[in-house]
Amino acid sequence: MLRIKLTYLLLCCLLVSNQLIQAQRVLHVDVLVVGGGASGITAGIQAARLNVKTLVVEETTWLGGMLSAAGVSATDGNHLLPSGLWGEFRERIYAHYGGPSKVATGWVSNTHFEPHVANQIWKEMASAEKSLQIIHQYQFRSAIVQKGSHISGARFINLQNESQLVVYAKQVIDATELGDVMASAGVPFDVGMEASATTGENVQVPATNDIIQDLTYVAILKDYGRGVDCTIVKPAGYDPTEFDGSCLDFYQDTTRIKPGVDCAKMITYAKLPGNKYMLNWPGHGNDIYLNLINLTPAERAKELVKAKQQTLRYIYFLQHQLGYKNLGLADDEFPTSDRLALIPYNREGRRLKGVIRFKVQDISKPFDQEFPLYRTGIAVGDYPIDHHHRKNPAAPQHLGFYPIPSFSIPLGALLPVSHSGLVVAEKGISVSNVVNGTTRLQPCVLLIGQAAGVLAALAAQNKKNDARQISVREVQSILLQQKAYLMPYADVNLSTPGFYSIQRIGACGFLRGKGQPNAWANRTWFEPDSTMTVYQFLSQLPALMPVNNQISKWLESAKSEGLLSVGRAVEFIEGIKKSTRKNTNVTSSNAQVSSSWTTWGLSNYNPERAITKRELAILLDKIVDPFSAFSVNHLGNYTSP
């Protein structure tokens, strides 16, 4: 009898032990990406392309975040900046629909697509990477922190059976919508608006507050044909005056801002291929103010019911009040019971207190700042600063669109000050509240994720617990290899001769672009075929060269000189190399440059004629190679030679 009892007890112990093992799955990877949204999926793909074992853990069944699961499938900005994985994704969108003209269906964007197509494309791109694993329907629960400040992994729970997943990683990327990983790990962050006195930004915020931007629960409507009535059941609390001022056809309360479009124009704002319409309308439409940041997952879900009801009331308004009865919730988009998006469109969450804080001044006047952060650029954007605050009367309503040119996001914005093992992406990077209004847009967030993937992969490969130890130039070099932009030049693309030289020299501050605020698509022009005077060229050299006694002498004599010629450029470049590169033989005579001219992709060698900026960039890159020779830190300051 005793033997039977002991055997039974042993079997019970084995059964319980087996259940515990099954209930808690443990994985070890090089790079863990928490969240498969816009930044998360590009971070995962890019890290895997660098041959490191990468895992993306995503809460939903979709990939792509705001581009797909949130339904914001009309991209904002970067039409002339098809950088890196954003450009690759867009090419796949073009291929799916039949070219750029087929996705220019609305007027808010140049690129519109169905959310489920975006999800399909991201899954196809992810499946092509052998070093990448995706796990769906696991919700982030907590970060694993060692010795108080090193993030070494994360814990998740399965949303279907509540089993646990524990992942240990050499590097963790926070690609969550609201910055949940850094909060769990105790990494310092900000929430809401900073006082103007704190940031030095001229936006007239008198005191720091915790106000974030409105969010939106997006719906995709489908045209079911004339005569078909798709009107939904009247939502509780419906009052058409809630949407007064959403369009000119329904504008009664003249104390509200006068709408700029009629209702027909409003509907086509984000018309998608397939006779579908995205609903993401800020002007008395379906925006809502909810601050979900400090809530539990269950509390967030409860609050989001309000956002869904806001959108349903707006849909009923369109159908019942404006007569668009033929437009109903698409039955072939989201795998949800209510046919709404899988997740909300979160415009803002926690913002990292990073190695640097990227502010409006760094964008509006990048060459005039104490720290030349543009030299550390890893992602580009060109959208204006766009804040949604109408649904929160406590929020300042005066911000508007601060005029800025296009910009480069600095690498230090992805890095915590003192915690190691963590890289921050998505909308959680270290930018001011104001700047978040432009860095939050889809193409920009995709590129932030790609840079995060490079940084984390390099840290894992080089066995660096702290990604801050990875060279800025090393990250930038790999991004260039991956066809990503460092500098936001609207007139220099991948097909432009000298693209890579221009990008490298621009990131050194040697030859500068001209910024131009421009409505919904800001610009920076490099003007590759333009010429410059000797003085204009030499006056930019101090931006590059920490040690050069010759510059002041050159500048004094240059005031009387005209346009910089090819021959004179070679002379200066020889002098630059000699004075900044110790123990280097200078052999770049005009004759030798002439023999290499065509090899470098140039034509019409004539020492007497004026040199173009493109040619000058190529000469500087090939002869001096300042991008490789001069290291920069996260502040953009040169640390060598």
Which residues does each predicted region cover?
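Conserved N-terminal/central alpha/beta ligand/cofactor-binding core
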Residues: 46, 52-53, 58-144, 149, ...
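N-terminal Rossmann-fold NAD(P) dinucleotide-binding loop
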Residues: 40
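Sec/Tat signal peptide C-region and signal peptidase I cleavage site
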Residues: 19-23
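Bacterial N-terminal signal peptides that target proteins for export
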Residues: 1-9
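Terminal recognition/anchoring or ligand-binding modules at protein termini
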Residues: 507-641
